[in-house]
From Swiss-Prot:
It comes from Salmonella typhi. SUPFAM superfamilies: HlyD-like secretion proteins. This is Multidrug resistance protein MdtA. It holds the Pfam family HlyD_D23. Part of a tripartite efflux system composed of MdtA, MdtB and MdtC. It is a peripheral membrane protein.
C-alpha cells in the first residue's frame, strides 16, 4: 500500500515538470515572431500620429494689411500749467477796508472794482489842496495887476526900477507856488483814486486774504486777494536737449507748432495751444530744456499748477507705411514681422521702424503697402508654416468701450 502511494506522487511530479518545460519551450519559440509584430504596430501608430498632425487643423492667426498714412511726428514731455500772470492785489494807501466787491473764485476783468478803502481822509486832503490852489491863484492874479501898474508908472519914473523888479519876482514866486499847489491837488486826487482798489489784470480771483473792517497798509505783503490770469494760460514742459534742433528748425521755417495738453493718465486730450517760446539754456542736471506753450483756455479745462502730458507736433510724414504695433516683434537680429503670402504661408521679415505709439508703428524699411502681417497667434509660428487667418472676436464690452485714443491721428515720437 505504501509503495503504491509513492508511485502516484512520482507520476504527479513528473507531469508538472513536463508541463512547465513545455510552456517554457513554447514561449521561447514564439518570442522572435511576436517582437516584429509589436514594433510594426508601434511604427504604424507613430506614422498615423504624424499624418494626423499634417492633416489636422491649421494654426489660427489674426492678420492686418500694411497701409499708407500721413503720420504726424510728436515730441512729448511732462509739464505743469502756469498762469500767464499772477498778481497779488495790494492797497497803495493806508486805511480801513470798508467793502469787498468780488466773490471768491470769480472771473474779473482789468479795471473792475475789487475793494474800497475809507475815502474820507483822502477827500479832506483833496479839498485842502484845492483850497490852497484857489488862494494862490487869487494871489497871483493880484500880483499880476500890481505888476502891470508898476510897469506903467516906471515909464514916467514914478516907481523905481527896484520896485518893478520886486513886483516881477513876486509874480514869478506865486506862479511857482501855484505849480506846487497843483501837484498837491493831483497827489490828493491820486490818493483818493487809490482808495478804490481795482483789478490790474483780467483773471480768476482766489480766496480773500483780509476781511472787511480791518486796517490795511500798503506794506502788507499778503495783500487783499491774488488774481491768476487763465485766459490765456501757459504750459511749461521739458524736452530732451536732443530735440532742440528739431524745434528750432521748425521755428525758423515759420511753422506754428501746435501743442496738445493731455491729462495725467495720458488718455484724454484737455486742450490745444501753440508754442510760445524756448528757454535760453539747458538744465545741466537733467539735460532738458524748458518749453512754454500758450492756450486760450476759454473752457477753463486747464488750471494753474495742474500736471499734464504735453505733445508738440513738429512734422508730418506723408505716405508712411503703417502696421499695428502688435505685429512688430523684437529678436536677436532686431525688429521683425511675420508676413503672409497668397497661400497663407508665413515668413519672418526684418524691418526698420520709425514713428510709433501704443497702436501703430511706421515701417521705414522692409515692408510695402498691401503686405499682410500677423498680429495675433505669433507664438505658434514657424518659418514657412501654413496658417488659418481668422477674424478677431469682438465682445460686447469692446463694442461699447471707445478706444483710449479715439480720434487721435498719427503717433507720438
Amino acid at each position: 500500500m505504501k509503495g503504491s502511494n509513492t508511485f502516484r506522487w512520482a507520476i504527479a511530479i513528473g507531469v508538472v515538470v513536463a508541463a512547465a518545460a513545455f510552456w517554457f519551450w513554447h514561449s521561447r519559440s514564439e518570442s522572435p515572431t511576436a517582437a516584429p509584430g509589436v514594433a510594426a504596430q508601434a511604427q504604424h501608430t507613430a506614422a498615423a500620429g504624424r499624418r494626423g498632425m499634417r492633416d489636422g487643423p491649421l494654426a489660427p492667426v489674426q492678420a492686418a494689411t500694411a497701409t499708407t498714412q500721413a503720420v504726424p511726428r510728436y515730441l512729448s514731455g511732462l509739464g505743469t500749467v502756469t498762469a500767464a500772470n499772477t498778481v497779488t492785489v495790494r492797497s497803495r494807501v493806508d486805511g480801513q477796508l470798508i467793502a469787498l466787491h468780488f466773490q471768491e473764485g470769480q472771473q474779473v476783468n482789468a479795471g473792475d472794482l475789487l475793494a474800497q478803502i475809507d475815502p474820507s481822509q483822502f477827500k479832506v486832503a483833496l479839498a485842502q489842496a484845492q483850497g490852497q490852489l484857489a488862494k494862490d491863484n487869487a494871489t497871483l492874479a493880484n500880483a499880476r495887476r500890481d505888476l502891470a501898474r508898476y510897469q506903467q508908472l516906471a515909464k514916467t519914473n514914478l516907481v523905481s526900477r527896484q520896485e518893478l523888479d520886486a513886483q516881477q519876482a513876486l509874480v514869478n514866486e506865486t506862479q511857482g507856488t501855484i505849480k506846487a499847489d497843483e501837484a498837491n491837488v493831483a497827489s490828493a486826487q491820486l490818493q483818493l483814486d487809490w482808495s478804490r482798489i481795482t483789478a490790474p489784470v483780467s483773471g480768476r480771483v482766489g480766496l480773500k486774504q483780509v476781511d472787511v473792517g480791518n486796517q490795511i497798509s500798503s506794506s502788507d505783503t499778503a495783500g487783499i486777494v491774488v488774481i491768476t490770469q487763465t485766459h490765456p494760460i501757459d504750459l511749461i514742459f521739458t524736452l530732451p536737449e536732443s530735440d532742440i534742433a528739431t524745434v528750432v528748425q521748425a521755428q525758423k521755417a515759420g511753422k506754428t507748432l501746435v501743442v496738445e495738453a493731455w491729462d495725467r493718465t495720458n488718455s484724454h486730450k484737455l486742450s490745444e495751444g501753440v508754442l510760445l517760446s524756448l528757454d535760453n539754456q539747458i538744465d545741466p542736471t537733467t539735460g532738458t530744456i524748458k518749453i512754454k506753450a500758450r492756450f486760450t483756455n476759454q473752457d477753463d479745462t486747464l488750471f494753474p499748477n495742474q500736471f499734464v502730458n504735453a505733445r508738440m507736433l513738429v512734422d508730418t510724414e506723408q505716405n508712411a507705411v503703417v502696421v499695428p504695433a502688435a505685429a512688430v516683434q523684437m529678436g536677436n537680429e532686431g525688429h521683425f514681422v511675420w508676413v503672409l503670402n497668397d497661400e497663407n504661408n508665413v515668413s519672418k521679415k526684418r524691418v526698420k521702424i520709425g514713428i510709433q505709439d501704443n497702436r501703430n508703428v511706421v515701417i521705414s524699411a522692409g515692408l510695402s503697402a498691401g503686405d499682410r502681417v500677423v498680429t495675433d497667434g505669433i507664438d505658434r509660428l514657424t518659418e514657412g508654416a501654413k496658417v488659418e487667418v481668422v477674424e478677431p472676436q469682438t465682445t460686447m464690452a469692446d463694442e461699447k468701450s471707445p478706444s483710449r485714443h479715439e480720434g487721435q491721428k498719427g503717433a507720438r515720437a
